[in-house]
C-alpha cells in the first residue's frame, strides 16, 4: 500500500485552454451551471451573443448564479437580490435597490474563446492570463466539409493520462487489436506549446485498402486539445478534433468532433465515428483502473512517451515528475 500511495502521485490540473461546452448548446440568454477545474461555474450567452464564464457564487449572500440567474444585456443577474455582474470583467454593474456599488462586489470572470464549434475557457492554477493560443480549424464549417458529427463522454481519468495515449503507439496492438505498431515520428514546435505526431494509418476496417498509403497527422496544443487529420487520400480529407477538460483531478469530460469532405462522408464518416467510440470504450477500463506512475520504468521503445512527459511539465504551475 505504501508503494502504491507513493507511486500514485496526484497530478495537479494543467494550465491551458479547455472546452466547457459545444457552441450549439448555448443560445442567446441561456444560463447554465457547469462544474470544471474543481470549481462551480456559470456559463451564459449575452444579448450581443458573447459566451461568458464566471464563478458561480454571488459575493453578496452566496446564491448560485446558475440556478435561477438571468441574462440582462451583457450581465448575469443574481436570482436572490438582483445584483448584476458583467460577464467580461466580473464587476457588479448594478444593484437595483442601491446606487453605490461596493468595491468588492465582483465575481471572477474567466477568459473565454469560442471557435471550432466549442466554447473554451482558460485555466491557470495561479489565475494568470492566457499565455498561448490555438488555431481555427478551417475544415469545421467549410463549404466542402460535412456537418460535424459529435461524441462526448465523462471518464474517471486524469487529462494527462488520456492525452498520453497519442504518444503510445505500442498500446494499439494490445488494447485496440492492431496487427502491428504503426511507425510514427514526433515533431515539437519551436514555441513549445504545440507538437505533431505523424504515423502510418493502420486499419483493418472495410475501407482499409483506400487508406493503406495514407498517414495520420496529430497536432496537439497543450494537454487535452488535439486535431487528427488524414494525409494522402487524393481529393479528400478527414478531421477529428477533440478537447478533454478536467472536471476534477481524476475526472474528465471529453468531446470529439468528426468532419469529412463531402465526397467521402457517406463512405467513411459513419465508420470513423464507430471506430472512435469503439476505441474510447477499449481505452476506458485502462484509464479507470490505472494509477499515475510519476517515475515510470521506461524501456528503449518508449521514446515518444518519455519525450511527452518532458514536454508536458511546462503546463503545470508546480513541479511534476
Where are each of the predicted segments found?
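Basic/polar N-terminal segments that are highly enriched at the extreme N-terminus
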Residues: 1-11, 321
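Non-catalytic accessory segments flanking enzyme active sites
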Residues: 7, 13-14, 175-177
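Rieske [2Fe-2S] iron-sulfur-binding domain
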Residues: 2-6, 19-140, 239
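C-terminal catalytic domain of Rieske-type non-heme iron oxygenases
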Residues: 50, 127-321
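A generic structural signal for short, non-catalytic loop/turn and secondary-structure boundary residues
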Residues: 12-13, 36, 105, 114, ...
Amino acid at each position: 500500500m505504501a508503494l502504491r500511495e507513493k507511486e500514485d502521485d496526484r497530478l495537479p490540473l494543467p494550465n491551458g485552454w479547455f472546452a466547457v461546452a459545444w457552441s450549439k448548446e448555448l443560445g442567446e440568454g441561456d444560463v447554465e451551471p457547469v462544474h470544471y477545474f474543481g470549481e462551480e461555474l456559470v456559463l451564459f450567452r449575452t444579448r450581443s451573443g458573447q459566451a461568458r464564464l464566471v464563478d458561480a457564487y454571488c459575493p453578496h449572500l452566496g446564491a448560485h448564479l446558475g440556478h435561477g440567474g438571468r441574462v440582462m444585456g451583457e450581465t448575469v443577474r443574481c436570482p436572490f437580490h438582483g445584483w448584476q455582474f458583467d460577464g467580461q470583467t466580473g464587476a457588479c454593474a448594478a444593484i437595483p435597490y442601491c446606487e453605490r456599488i461596493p468595491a468588492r462586489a465582483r465575481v471572477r470572470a474567466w477568459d473565454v474563446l469560442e471557435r471550432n464549434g466549442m466554447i473554451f475557457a482558460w485555466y491557470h492554477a495561479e489565475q494568470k492570463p492566457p499565455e498561448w493560443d490555438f488555431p481555427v480549424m478551417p475544415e469545421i464549417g467549410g463549404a466542402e466539409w460535412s456537418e460535424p458529427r459529435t461524441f462526448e463522454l465523462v471518464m474517471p481519468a486524469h487529462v494527462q493520462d488520456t492525452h498520453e495515449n497519442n504518444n503510445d503507439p505500442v498500446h494499439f496492438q494490445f488494447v485496440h487489436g492492431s496487427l502491428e505498431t504503426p511507425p510514427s515520428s514526433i515533431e515539437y514546435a519551436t514555441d513549445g506549446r504545440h507538437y505533431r505526431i505523424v504515423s502510418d494509418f493502420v486499419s483493418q476496417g472495410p475501407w482499409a485498402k483506400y487508406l493503406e498509403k495514407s498517414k495520420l497527422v496529430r497536432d496537439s496544443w497543450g494537454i487535452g486539445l488535439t486535431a487528427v487529420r488524414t494525409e494522402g487520400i487524393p481529393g479528400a480529407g478527414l478531421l477529428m478534433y477533440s478537447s478533454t477538460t478536467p472536471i476534477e483531478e481524476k475526472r474528465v469530460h471529453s468531446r470529439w468532433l468528426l468532419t469529412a469532405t463531402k465526397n467521402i462522408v457517406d463512405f467513411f464518416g459513419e465508420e470513423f465515428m464507430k471506430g472512435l467510440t469503439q476505441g474510447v470504450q477499449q481505452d476506458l477500463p485502462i484509464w479507470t483502473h490505472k494509477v499515475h506512475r510519476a517515475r515510470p520504468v521506461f524501456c528503449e521503445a518508449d521514446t515518444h512517451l518519455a519525450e511527452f512527459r518532458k514536454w508536458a511539465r511546462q503546463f503545470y504551475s508546480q513541479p511534476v515528475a
